[in-house]
């Protein structure tokens, strides 16, 4: 995307400057003709950046605006359109719409498996990650574990996708009270997270610390859990704001640890 109308918005997003990325992307989108490729991509960046600021309802509305444009430009079965559907679905789970997210991610994963090429393979992993998160959120931890392991077996790269799948696996194990197994997965995720370049780590700010805090609380290692939860909360608050799903989860965990929330 270097040298294109969306290059600045993309660079701002990758630098974690989400408010600036959103503003730039929306400016580009408004300036482009109807059904223009760069206008469509700008809408996608705007949706991602809005969600990263914890404004999940607005982000979903932006995805809803972008989806028909992507369909007209690229076609319903193109990997970019399918990726947009996956991203949109995962925004739903940030709003508590877990069953809808699960169903849509499953549909995208099926479509991706029918496709060919590395983009479709990455998309299948991304959609399965959305399913794993939604299953965990519904308390269906054994199903989430099975799907996370299947996805990790199919996706061998040590990249951000493997990171989020491992975090989902840790969450599923913790949900089954298999805390030592979950701790091992959290340690693996931490090692992988540290190996990634900065721009790939930013979207998962606080996620590894939150995973550790949740597991340690399950193991009744309360002082360690509280320290990790506080680090996660402060990092998420600084990066994403108070209303982001991960910030809220970290804050809720801190309240549970402190006994102010059941």
Regions found by a protein language model. Name each.
Residues 1-262:
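Intrinsic-disorder-linked linear interaction elements in eukaryotic regulatory proteins
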């Amino acid at each position: 995307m270097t040298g294109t109308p969306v290059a600045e918005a993309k660079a701002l997003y990758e630098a974690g400057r989400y408010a600036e990325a959103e503003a730039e992307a929306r400016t580009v989108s408004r300036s482009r003709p109807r059904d223009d490729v760069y206008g469509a991509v700008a809408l996608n960046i705007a949706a991602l950046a809005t969600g990263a600021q914890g404004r999940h309802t607005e982000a979903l509305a932006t995805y809803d605006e972008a989806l028909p444009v992507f369909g007209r430009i690229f076609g319903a079965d193109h990997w970019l359109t399918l990726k947009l559907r996956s991203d949109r679905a995962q925004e739903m789970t940030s709003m508590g719409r877990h069953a809808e997210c699960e169903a849509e991610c499953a549909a995208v994963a099926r479509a991706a498996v029918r496709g060919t090429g590395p983009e479709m393979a990455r998309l299948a992993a991304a959609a399965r990650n959305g399913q794993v998160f939604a299953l965990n959120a519904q308390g269906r931890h054994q199903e989430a574990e099975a799907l996370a392991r299947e996805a990790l077996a199919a996706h061998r790269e040590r990249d951000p996708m493997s990171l989020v799948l491992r975090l989902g696996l840790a969450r599923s194990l913790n949900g089954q009270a298999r805390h030592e197994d979950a701790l091992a997965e959290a340690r693996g995720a931490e090692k992988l997270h540290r190996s990634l370049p900065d721009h790939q780590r930013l979207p998962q700010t606080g996620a590894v610390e939150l995973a550790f805090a949740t597991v340690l609380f399950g193991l009744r290692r309360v002082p360690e859990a509280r320290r990790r939860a506080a680090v996660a909360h402060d990092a998420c608050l600084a990066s994403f704001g108070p209303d982001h799903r991960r910030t809220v989860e970290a804050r809720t965990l801190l309240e549970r640890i402190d006994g102010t929330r059941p």
